[in-house]
Amino acid sequence: NTKYSFKLFVIFDTGATGDFKFRHAGPSSPTLVRIRRHHIIGAGTAYAGIAIDTAYSSVDVAVAGSAGPGVVEMDGIVHNGANAGNFEFQWAQNASEAVDTTVRAGSYIQYRAL
């Protein structure tokens, strides 16, 4: 039944068609989820996908664009219910391509109990 706040910052590189996809997940039946998220597509210059989520992801969020670096940022609060488990950031390359999508060292999740 712990309450948490968190901040996530992910830097990735992707090829022209591989792109990036992600979702957030956690223990079932939280009592509160409020997550602000946005991203910059590969080689982009402006935020996109700006949203406030009130539940964990039910589908992947695709970050499709051009080859190059991109960013995903999230922050929020989670009030966990009675079920144990971890908050997770899950990611993958969105489409098959010869160039691997890479999450760069220095990407992070910070959290604290409230």
Question: Where do the protein language model's features map onto the residues?
Answer:
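Surface-exposed molecular-recognition determinants
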Residues: N1-L114
